[in-house]
């Protein structure tokens, strides 16, 4: 390999890949992955790793064979296992002359703009020094992640990190080749989907039918991660980490796994922060007409298109936008509080004054303060 197509890469290493299905870390597999990453760094690629495996490492250290369901017990194992995991990575990268750093994040770390920028600046500084940063969600305090909440898995965390550092490529490596037309463990005739230009409802249904017993993230969360990454202008690939030299092949542009094509629009820093969805105070559900106008034409959201507001938020807060089916449309800065929106939803712009005794303009969310995913 003489040249790589991507200059800044986030690599997510899943539990199923790192354990090989045994529940214990596979040191040979980890050594080979680290070798590939080291070779890529020698070619000038900046790399951040989002690594699962802390709880698995803790189980192995303590000789615990069963998968715990109790949250405090999982947190204990994560605390024990995280140091083991970092020690393994340090030992594996040291022969290649590389230093590793640990980055433990929680959603609250990135939920405000200053925290987001501080984390970004730290990661960029580490990359500039040639350090391999190993990122994980802080399982010891991140209750949502331990409980396998939808937004707290390492798949989505890897997409957030790719968003954060403006990566060119997000590699989600697991024990399956990519997204299939049906679950290949149940349907041998299933075929690999090699390229995705748009994440449709049909693809989401395919992902929901797949299975993964070891990690917190199945194919559904990988698809969610791919959506965030591509909306942020990042190419995302889901691939089998067992394929020989898979990291080097994908970084060189070879066709393996399922490749998700990024949006042509490259969002700016503020838009990327909004896209992360970490700073939302509530949500606004819109009707089908408004959803179409937002998706296809990037129009401002008017009160007439609003069906309801959920949560408690004020003017100037960032909210999530959903369609009438609950599907996420994007994020925006609202001109009206949740209380005011409950009064003006469905109304035409000329009716707002009479209801509120004054208004903040016809737009509930102006298109300049809106990002569509």
UniProtKB/Swiss-Prot annotation:
The keyword Kinase applies. Its main location: cytoplasm. One of its GO terms (cellular component) is cytosol. Pathway: Amino-acid biosynthesis; L-proline biosynthesis; L-glutamate 5-semialdehyde from L-glutamate: step 1/2. ATP binds at residues 12, 216-222. Transmembrane segments: none annotated. Keywords: Amino-acid biosynthesis, ATP-binding, Cytoplasm, Kinase, Nucleotide-binding, Proline biosynthesis, Transferase. This is Glutamate 5-kinase. It comes from Dehalococcoides mccartyi (strain ATCC BAA-2100 / JCM 16839 / KCTC 5957 / BAV1). The lineage of its organism: Bacteria, Bacillati, Chloroflexota, Dehalococcoidia, Dehalococcoidales.
């Amino acid at each position: 390999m003489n040249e790589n197509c991507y200059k800044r890469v986030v690599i997510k290493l899943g539990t199923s890949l790192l354990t090989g299905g045994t529940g214990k870390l596979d040191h040979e597999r980890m050594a080979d992955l680290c070798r590939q990453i080291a070779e890529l760094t020698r070619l000038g690629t900046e790399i951040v790793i989002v690594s699962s495996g802390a709880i698995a490492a803790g189980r192995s250290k303590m000789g615990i064979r069963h998968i715990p369901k109790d949250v405090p017990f999982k947190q204990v194992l994560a605390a024990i296992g995280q140091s083991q995991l970092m020690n393994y990575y340090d030992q594996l990268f040291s022969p290649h002359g590389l230093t590793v750093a640990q980055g433990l994040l929680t959603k609250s770390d990135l939920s405000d703009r200053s925290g987001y920028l501080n984390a970004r600046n730290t990661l960029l500084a580490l990359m500039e020094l040639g350090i391999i940063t190993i990122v994980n969600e802080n399982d010891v305090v991140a209750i949502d992640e331990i409980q396998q909440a939808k937004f707290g898995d390492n798949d989505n965390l890897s997409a957030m990190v790719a968003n954060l550092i403006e990566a060119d490529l997000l590699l989600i490596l697991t024990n399956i080749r990519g997204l299939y037309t049906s679950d290949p463990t149940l349907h041998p005739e299933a075929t690999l989907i090699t390229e995705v230009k748009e994440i449709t409802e049909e693809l989401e249904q395919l992902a929901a039918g797949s299975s993964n017993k070891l990690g917190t993230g199945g194919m559904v969360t990988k698809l969610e991660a791919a959506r965030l990454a591509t909306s942020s202008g990042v190419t995302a690939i889901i691939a089998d980490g067992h394929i020989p030299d898979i990291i080097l092949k994908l970084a060189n542009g070879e066709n393996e796994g399922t490749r998700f094509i990024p949006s042509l629009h490259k969002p700016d820093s503020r838009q990327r922060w909004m896209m992360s969805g970490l700073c939302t105070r509530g949500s606004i559900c819109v009707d089908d007409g408004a959803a179409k106008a937002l998706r296809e034409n990037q129009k401002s959201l008017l009160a007439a298109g609003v069906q309801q507001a959920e949560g408690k938020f004020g003017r100037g807060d960032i909210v999530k936008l959903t369609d009438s089916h609950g599907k996420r449309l994007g994020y925006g800065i609202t001109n009206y509080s949740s209380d005011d929106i409950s009064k003006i939803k469905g109304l035409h712009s000329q009716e707002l004054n009479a209801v509120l005794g004054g208004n903040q303009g016809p737009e509930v969310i102006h298109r300049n303060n809106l990002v569509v995913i």
